[in-house]
């Protein structure tokens, strides 16, 4: 087993090395300029996300689709991942993470656009879409579409299911002393109540859970920043200067280089917002929307909230806390966020614990739909119920077993998902540009599209 784990670890490191980072970041930059900087319409996207398009075709509201995508995206990576990036790459990693989110918005925009453009209406009236449908219907590459679906289904049992259940069980054990098997049963029952209801039930829960957990976490960050008010601006200066001159950080960050700051900041940003991975457009295709561009704008806001807001807030909290409290150092590594939140009297540690628990549970819900849509593409609706039950059972086993090998396999599957998705994005970028010109730059966002 150790040999297999080592092999997947090597494969994961290779797949998520500089070639993948350059490919993803290059796609972000290419689409930003190919689509004429759609980030300029951020406020329009935010407005559309909270404005129901009830008469349009689709299964869930645009906000429901966004909330479900955010449920799967906003996870422990926003908390632990940023801390790891700062510990390994220095304060400058925060700026690189933030910039990755800014440019990643264009990729998430293109993913949402193509998802709606090539979605299909099943016999039961439900909408299905995502990279697999764009690859098949837009590029006639069904073989690559099937590969994407297989990688997505496998990834759903890893990063979306067992890994999250394990995080919840271990945290509940460490914090409250609860047996992992008992926590596993509870998570299974709670998840079953939502997942067995399908996308409408998942979206309904996510529209309540996601805003609540995100606002609560951000408020916690704001409290810490108020406590560290004298160090906030110095932290901003340190983040900016050390991104290009790590020696400016001094102290324990002296070992960091510009390459390390960029490497860990960019990688964490890419992991965090999933722009380019191809997962979020699966639920974007289910949105009630009049045309592809409306949902594309809404989808792009997901990267803004996840990386530009939440990851940036986490980074600012960490760096300002290191400056404010001499007992907090980069050596705390992944525990940096926990140490920083512990400075809030009485409620700091419980608040962070609750945040991690809800982030992990919401990821379970979002990824269950991604995996179900993938197996539905391969085998049809007859396997949906079986997949849901298998996913719920896997949650229990995830809570009680060692998951080192699962982490490495999940990382590999996520990288392998990205490759077919990036092929679709780059080869169909001309279509995305045409649709953007037709609806967005011609001010025709209220026009209806023709759907098959």
Kindly label every feature range from the protein language model.
Residues 103-111, 185-199, 210-230, 263, ...:
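Selective recognition of specific alpha-helical transmembrane segments in multi-pass small-molecule
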